[in-house]
């Protein structure tokens, strides 16, 4: 079984995003221009937006998934292993691979 390293913080420094563990130790880093805008993160994954596409990454910046903004809508929040997106009059709860878990009317 693969050990999961908890994401405790993400910082932008010298045009690089750094993922830190609970001790403040660097887990990984990647250039800002490769990732785009940080939308949100949890202890499990991160969501970035670049050129109208949302990207989900793990703690090593390995891509979990990507989907068009037009397909997902607006990212409301990222918590645990889920992210909530608002599209039209619906809120979609999605996993870290952007698979739909549930949806509800706003």
Where are these regions (language model features)?
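Short beta-strand elements that form the blades of beta-propeller/WD-repeat-like
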Residues: 2-12, 18, 42-50, 54-55, ...
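Beta-strand-rich domains and repeat architectures in extracellular enzymes and scaffolds
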Residues: 2-9, 26-37
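Surface-exposed loop/turn elements that mediate protein-protein interactions on large endomembrane-trafficking
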Residues: 16-32, 55-69, 92-106
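Residue-level detector of conserved, function-critical positions
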Residues: 30-41, 45-47, 67-84, 105-106
């Amino acid at each position: 079984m693969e050990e999961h390293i908890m994401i405790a913080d993400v910082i932008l420094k010298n045009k690089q995003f750094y993922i830190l563990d609970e001790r403040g130790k660097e887990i990984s880093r990647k250039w800002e221009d490769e990732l785009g805008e940080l939308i949100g993160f949890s202890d499990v994954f991160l969501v970035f937006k670049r050129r109208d596409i949302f990207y989900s990454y793990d703690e090593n910046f390995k891509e979990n998934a990507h989907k068009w903004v037009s397909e997902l809508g607006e990212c409301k929040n990222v918590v645990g292993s889920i992210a909530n997106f608002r599209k039209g009059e619906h809120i979609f709860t999605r996993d870290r691979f952007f698979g739909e878990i549930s949806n509800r009317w706003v």
